């Protein structure tokens, strides 16, 4: 058995021992004192570093030098990072993407920690993190490790360290990886005063970091440990804040101060992380980190990255936010380990991680290189061979290895190989209906779409398309349009469809549009419209919804009859025909006549993203121009690729027509639906590509949500999903909420809990969400503590933060307004605080 040094003067066995409440209160007071945030002043005549006060919406646009953030945005190439060893797990260098989680019990509770670690290992965790905030926790860690080794459990453990370099040195005796936060490892425990840093003082801070951090580097180097340099948005040191502001650039420069010391001391077993509760900021931070490493990459020193959206929350909300942030980076080949930080039990984080990786394998890319296509097919045929990986790594500079993925990189193969690959594709992907479909799609793509380059997705100044105000006010929502697809049968149940489309009642009991009401609906098989369905359509139009109908002779006749029977202007104008781009001449001729009669607002065109550029260019000269485009990819797994292509084409041609994502989700299980909608659509919207979203879940049944492996925390969400249409609405609105494109409810920053948490975070979060979930645009932080700093609450309007066992501090912005509120009173006090600042609305 391994022996570890113990301090005999302390009782490191937690069982039956209670925390000293006086110590907790003392530490809490100190933390509150250190985390007080104040604006740095300015004095004339001094060489100063000014604190930058930057609005949240501008944080994406302050970066001036992102030229390349990944290997390729058109096809999958894993970022080539150094291989790092963490115990018996290797990450980076095309190794499997490692999955990790974190215990949520007190680290001094040895038995409970061991049980949690064992359960996480059994359910697929590659490593487990524990909080180590003091000497007692560090000493308890020795016993935890001994118990695990006695049962031959060698899963790597990660120590979460804040504030105390001495504790980090102790933890290195036990843990395979030490996570340090540059924002508080050295100079986090200090008074945040109106300090103006001179250049000399700023540089002296680096010497202090060297003094405290190098001993840990030397010890980890000697013991073959790894170090994660984990920066958190909102927890930067006052030095960094004074120079860079609370920005992605500040996060990266803070991390580089630590990594440069590692490199100077020839220690390369390091991992980066750039976490934020805002997926928008998190993605930009990692992209900038990669871009900066490309610039600094003289000796192949691009280090692996751990991905995570911190304080994501629980249930579908937490999953969607994480799938957006983590998935969009993995899609572009960035990331070597992941954690989905949920306000749930540690093991509940593992299944979503697996689902994300599993569904990422289905992404579709295309190639015109014979060796790539042949190699891809070979790997598919030998997917259980010695080189099989659960990931989709890149092998070398010239060969894209799509191991066990649903790639279509097969067009250049011999006829025999191509046929085998097509059969494999058809078996694996339920969205492909025949071998012939796959073959035709491949050929169509190769002839048109392999030559685009991204120039207009400007990473330095990401902005939305400018849309004609008249179109916005008349048809599209001013922020982002919400659409849905309904069938005739669903329209026959008017009460259910009103509920599913989030139509509200006014004080007189009349139907009206609300903050989350659907804006446009597409009626599937409109030609089969029944009398009862017609009545529902009429009511929806009266409320203000727009109805999209496919332009074909039978449907035109039905619409004419409807207009004859009801001559109201809304009925005439709110039905909009759409057709495929190649049929534009027919619809154009029809609409010239209709618009002259003032019978219609316009029309829409649908495209799949594979059209010839010359065909798309015709849109520019159409008169009248289409109101908007519907971008409907052949399968969701290629939607990111075709969106990037279409975005380039319409910008390069100067086409000022908005486009709406129209995505069919053919998955059966709820978790797959969540992943595919969030990942393949959210990745586009997070870059502000697109002006609306229509999600169409095609294989929904009531059993789909009941049989899926979804955590218990999602029971309340399932009650919102009573039908296929309601699921479409739920997905669309939550994706728009988490991309922060269109807010319709309260936004929560909820920590996942750890050994520092001072109350039941899961139950507390549920209760606060139940009380405040209707407050559109309000942001509430629910934190077990604020160990990473008061800025960890990000841009929350209000904060509910643990200060002592069953005691809570309440914040307005970054200002503490009430201390040590008893937990049973804190909910009412929070609502009073919200009302005081005029953010409350009655449900």
Protein language model regions, located:
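N-terminal chloroplast transit peptides
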Residues: 1-16
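N-terminal amphipathic alpha-helix/helix-capping segment at the start of soluble metabolic enzymes
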Residues: 53-101, 366-369, 375-497
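Short, acidic/polar
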Residues: 108-119, 164-168, 322-326, 491-510, ...
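Hydrophobic faces of well-ordered beta-strands that scaffold small-molecule active sites
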Residues: 97-103, 128-130, 157-161, 178-180, ...
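Beta-strand/loop-dominated core regions that host nucleotide or nucleotide-derived cofactor-binding catalytic loops
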Residues: 533, 805-808, 816-839
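N-terminal organelle-targeting presequences
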Residues: 23-59
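Active-site beta->alpha loop and helix N-cap motifs at the rims of alpha/beta catalytic domains
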Residues: 125-257, 484-640
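Catalytic alpha/beta core domains of metabolic enzymes, predominantly
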Residues: 196-209, 240-388, 394-395, 402-419, ...
